[in-house]
């Protein structure tokens, strides 16, 4: 049974009790117990670019790249704690070479290259509506990235679990490439998760309205669970809690903190595949290239939300939307380059 998550820790640095929590987080980071994982396998197609999304320039009067903004956010924590954080960057087959070359070209934006580790996301075959493999060429099956739930298995496959164990990393902060305001390896978030004896934490924002297209952190059979926005029923959208507030109101922003020993446990399990209808480039029976304008088959993905369901606890950690949520999914309009620029400027970041 799914029910709303009734407890949420709200980030408010004016509260005196936050000082010990921040100390716990800073101490863990300073001792090298926290690593970060950047999910950066996407391309900038919807932004009008054929390059990796992270290389997109959002600057106005100067060059400001998405990757650069994220490294700057991470450097804020390095300066606070005096300790570099290992950053594991998940790329895809399509953008791996371009991503690595871009980081080298920009001298890793001043971050020590020994602390940045690239690995490629695993791929999954695509099929037509009858379940038959689509072909990319006469000798190659059409494939696509296997979803954001496959990140830890791909990291292990690259051998980086040995770096994690050797460095004594106990927590991994996983975050998406397209939110240029988020704090990474955030001491308060880390400290709050540890202090509340949770094995996972999720940064959440309060939804602007019941129809906002974000997944919602809930409880399902007393386990943490994320319900995607398209799965929310009208009853759930209109439900209120004991205070008369919207009940299903904690929107996730794909910024999670996982205890590494829990990740090892989950890695031994099989996450369910999600079938997603997509436009898939392929060849037809005569070997001619097909670039469909409408969906023509299925991709198969695993999702982080299914990892969350396998955990006993997940702290809902509310952040201030205007200070930590500037997603770049479109070129204009909602969640766009334009809207992100405005939020960055409001936070004093020169563009």
Model-derived features: positions:
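N-terminal glycine-rich phosphate-binding loop and ensuing alpha1 helix
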Residues: 1-116, 135-152, 160-161, 303-305, ...
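Structural beta-sheet core signal
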Residues: 36-38, 89, 118, 174, ...
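Active-site-adjacent bridging/hinge elements
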Residues: 37-49, 128, 233-234, 275-278
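An acidic- and aromatic-residue-enriched active-site/binding cleft used to recognize and process polar
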Residues: 39-43, 52, 60, 92-95, ...
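Generic domain-boundary/flexible-linker signal
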Residues: 47-48, 98, 129, 183, ...
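A broad, structure-centric signal for solvent-exposed, well-ordered loop/edge residues
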Residues: 54, 62-65, 126, 265, ...
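Conserved beta-loop-beta/alpha segment of the NTase-like Rossmann-fold superfamily
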Residues: 108-109, 113-213
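Catalytic core of tubulin tyrosine ligase-like
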Residues: 168-173, 181-185, 190-350
